[in-house]
Amino acid sequence: MKKALFALFMMVSIAMLAACGNSQGSGSKSKDGDLWASVKKKGVLTVGTEGTYEPFTFHDKKSDKLTGYDVEVIQEVAKRLGLKADFKETQWDSMFAGLNAKRFDVVANQVGKTGRENQYDFSDKYTTSNAVVVTKKDSTIAKEADVKGKTAAQSLTSNYNKLAKEAGAKIEGVEGMAQSLQLIQQGRADLTYNDKLAVLNYLKTSGNKNVKIAFEAGQPQQTYFAFRKGSGELVTHVNKALKEMKEDGTLSKIAKKWFGEDVSK
């Protein structure tokens, strides 16, 4: 009798645990679906971006309008999803805190995912570039080994900061590339790691002859749109739009407009 009651108790317990597991699973799916449903209902995709990182996300000097490669790509994605992109400009080192706090649904700001895979969801890649090291024009820094012990001006939460640390540099925290280059010219930093496309654009548009690209560093860098964990259905729709843009040539067209070549591959 006792054995029969014990067996019955165990069967009921297992059934209850299974029900709880199913409930949690459907709740997780509901959470994903709720975010997409909420975004779709509002008709707005809220986007976190710097607005100071030319040519990816910055303000046009004449119109003061927010523009750039990342801005145009996410605007086109939103358009294809029947949404309007609403940009919330945020300093880079506060970007992921803002995403976590639900100030925006997605980050469009040349985000690398190395070291962040467990904390965030990511879209498919939409840019491939290289990291470069920038120094003063007369600097003797010419290779990775020369970086050790030197001062690198870096945004503390960027992947470029990680590259500088791995090379043995001392880190001087900054808010973005513009401040990094300023510190180099002032002699307060020796170098900075940053995106090759951004640096080439800066050298081309600024006319600044006081700094140079010393060398390329690390492996090619891919960039992605970043989302909070559990944004699955929204990520799926964004990836669908990106896939369409790659297939019909729109993404390549936007890339060539900004860089003269297709950097989306």
Residue ranges, per PLM feature:
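C-terminal motif of bacterial Sec signal peptides marking the signal peptidase cleavage site
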Residues: 16-19
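Extended ligand-binding regions for polar small-molecule ligands
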Residues: 21-23, 71-80, 158, 222-262
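Extracytoplasmic small-molecule ligand-binding "clamshell" domains
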Residues: 28-109
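Short loop->beta-strand "edge-of-pocket" segments that line small-molecule binding or catalytic clefts
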Residues: 43-49, 144-157
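Periplasmic-binding protein-like
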Residues: 51, 128-135, 196, 200-243, ...
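Short helix-initiation/N-cap motifs at beta->coil->alpha
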Residues: 71-72, 86-97, 157, 172-186, ...
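Acidic, polar ligand-binding/catalytic clefts
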Residues: 79, 84-146
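Alpha-to-beta junction loops
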Residues: 82-84, 100-109, 186-198, 209
